[in-house]
Amino acid sequence: MATVRVGGHITLLFSIHDDALLPRNQGSRGAGICLEHGVSVSIQESGRSEVIEVGQEMAGWYQDIPDIKSKGTTEVTINAQIPSESLSEQMYDDLIDELRQARLLPIDANYSIHVDIELPLSQGFGMSAAGLSALALACFQMTEKGSVPQYFRAAHHIERRYSGGLGDVLGLYVGGVELRTHPGSPPSPGVARGFSLDSHILLVWQSSESKHTSEYIDHPDWKASITRAGDAAVDRLATKQWDASIWNELLNEAQTFGRMSKMLEEPSRQSMLASVQSVVNELNLQAKVRARLCMLGTSCVLLPAKSNEPLEESDLLQFSERLRSINLDSIVTRIAPQRVV
């Protein structure tokens, strides 16, 4: 048995590059933040399938013909802290099949999988990427076959199959505050880099509104406006040193992206962000806090205004209480550290 927890991922700005034939070449350029809260996955082998044709012994130089075994079964149980209609057990089953085809898992093994999801789905928190990455890494931990990048690549393939995200898996692969400069699966052709920034942050969402990523990345008008704004932002950021010194510029680019991509023009997002900003003003946190949209949910994140002045958990808990009174949900989490890859 193996258990792995992978935090979620929020995207602050991005462009869409999903026209390539192969899933490994599809993805996004963009910038985002990896989270402490996410998805925990446990996997346990629960037996082997039956032999459907017994092998034969051969004379001469030929090897024996091995037994032919049926494909193993996969039983998936999902526990979501926040119930959602978007739960997909099949997604996890498909990842197991992908790893079987890559010969990283035995074809005849039966598996029992338990998934614990800590954040809401379809709110831009990267839960599909976190869940798939956690299952992939749990399989690696269980078998110790292959290498970690192979498992991340498989997770990216399945996420693209379900249009669950574009660059979330690549972002999680590098961790921290990340910049994705070339689309695709990790470790290649996707290219990304990250840095660590230790701070509490607050995720905010409107439960009555949720958006599946495919509503945008599969829509030609949204795709065009998002990609124009996202590519321009990444081009500017990519010329700079990617460390904590870029923080203020990243916050500015995220705000510009929301406006240029027209995401800020959507009434539900506009209303939510205005409500959050009014609480920022009410609690006199204007100098400490910046609110930015999470792509692509009806959600936002409260981030430190300065990289060297992390947010206090007590301030964010007070903020969360106030949001509850205006029917906005929230949770305090942290920025996850950069991964060593």
In which residue ranges do the predicted regions lie?
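Short glycine/serine- and small hydrophobic-enriched flexible loop segments
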Residues: 97, 134-141, 235, 256-259
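DPxDG-like acidic metal-binding loop motif
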Residues: 123-148
